[in-house]
UniProtKB/Swiss-Prot annotation:
Belongs to the pyruvate, phosphate/water dikinase regulatory protein family. PSRP subfamily. Signal peptide: none annotated. GO terms for molecular function: ADP binding; ATP binding; phosphotransferase activity, phosphate group as acceptor; protein serine/threonine kinase activity. This is Putative phosphoenolpyruvate synthase regulatory protein. Its EC number is 2.7.11.33, 2.7.4.28. Bifunctional serine/threonine kinase and phosphorylase involved in the regulation of the phosphoenolpyruvate synthase (PEPS) by catalyzing its phosphorylation/dephosphorylation. ADP binds at residues 152-159. The keyword Metal-binding does not apply.
Length: 271
């Protein structure tokens, strides 16, 4: 079964997309064709969107789901004429909140993603630059500045997690790959030992790691299942021996990995 889902907004569409994805994830047996349409900020764009929704309805034989965060009443009225199942995200939540708080909302476009704290913005940009500069064990001499150091096998998700932590939380995260040479020594790499309290380990199912590595270096020893099994087994033994907290990332998205790291380590979002 397939349904089309539109995520529409007069801003970036990030809020509609995030909440819509979270809701649709609860329906695992249904395949969704996801379409994000940002910046529907005038009536002409709204009418064009109505045509797209109606066309999708004709093709699918089912009306599309339409998640929207449109704040302009006139534009919303036009879109409501489309042959779609409308999910008014702001209306659903703001109306009860207005009643509870006895106050009218501002209905401002893009409010949730506005840069209203210059210090927080600068902190996040600095954290992103730190993650890039200290990726893959490149500059271990800067580890004293890190809030967190992710370690793990090559291709276990360290880099995207560091960047997400930087962008979303302002966390200065470095990462260090545990290599076969490190495992042969059967002890923690010397560059990491002074910063043990900042370490957090990532692990992954060997089968999944082999699949990921095969995309990079197909049919190599590096990507073989046997090699991946050996590395993961030894790395997990090191985590346990050194009492380093760690997480199996196989079933988690970058967002989920990052949130679990924040909870486990007790790190706080920089605002």
């Amino acid at each position: 079964m397939k349904r089309t889902a539109f995520f529409i907004s007069d801003g970036t569409g990030l809020t509609a997309e995030a909440l819509g994805h979270a809701l649709l994830a609860q329906f695992e047996k249904i395949e969704f064709e996801r379409v994000t349409v940002p910046y529907i900020d005038d009536e002409e764009k709204a009418r064009d969107l109505v045509s797209r929704i109606n066309k999708a309805s004709e093709i699918d034989g089912e009306r599309p789901l339409v998640f929207d965060t449109i704040v302009n009443g006139g534009i919303r009225e036009i879109i409501s004429r489309a042959d779609g199942f409308m999910v008014d995200i702001f209306g659903t939540f703001l109306n009860p909140l207005e009643q509870e708080l006895n106050s009218s909302s501002s209905y401002s476009v893009g409010k949730s993603h506005s840069i209203n704290n210059a210090g927080s913005y600068e902190r996040r940009i600095h954290a992103v630059n730190f993650a890039l500069d200290n990726d893959d064990g490149a500059r271990t001499r800067h580890y004293d500045e890190a809030d967190l150091i992710l370690i793990g096998a090559s291709r276990s998700g360290k880099t995207p997690t560091c960047l997400y932590l930087a962008l979303q939380y302002g966390i200065k995260a470095a990462n260090y790959p545990i290599t076969e040479e490190d495992l042969d020594d059967q002890k923690m790499p010397a560059a990491l030992r002074p910063h043990k309290e900042k370490l957090f380990g990532l692990t992954i199912e060997p089968e999944r790691l082999a699949t990921i590595r095969n995309e990079r270096r197909p049919n190599s020893r590096y990507s073989s299942l046997q090699q991946c099994m050996h590395e993961i087994e030894e790395i997990e033994l090191m985590y346990k021996r050194e009492r380093i907290p760690y997480l199996n990332t196989t079933a988690y998205s970058v967002e989920e990995i990052s949130t679990r790291i924040m909870v486990t380590t007790g790190l706080k979002r920089h605002r």
